[in-house]
């Protein structure tokens, strides 16, 4: 599992990016966020996640809020 902070997340479009210290930003789609109800992330929020290879490069999977 990796950890990082949400750089930005657009709730209307359902995606954003997570900052990884010492690494590249990682794309995150709302479908990767674990939990019930409306799936969104807040800027600056700390999260844990796995990195998987998506259609357009690395993206976050199994995202949990810390």
From Swiss-Prot:
GO biological process, alphabetically ordered: regulation of gene expression
The keyword Transferase appears for this protein: no
Keyword Lipoprotein: no
Domain CSD: 4-63
GO molecular function list: DNA binding; nucleic acid binding
InterPro entries in UniProt: Cold_shock_CspA, Cold_shock_domain, CSD, CSD_CS, CSP_DNA-bd, NA-bd_OB-fold
Record keywords, A-Z: Activator, Cytoplasm, DNA-binding, Transcription, Transcription regulation
GO cellular component: cytoplasm
SMART domains (UniProt xref): CSP
Main location (coarse class): cytoplasm
Subunit and interaction comment: Homodimer.
Protein name per Swiss-Prot or TrEMBL: Cold shock-like protein CspD
Lineage: Bacteria, Bacillati, Bacillota, Bacilli, Bacillales
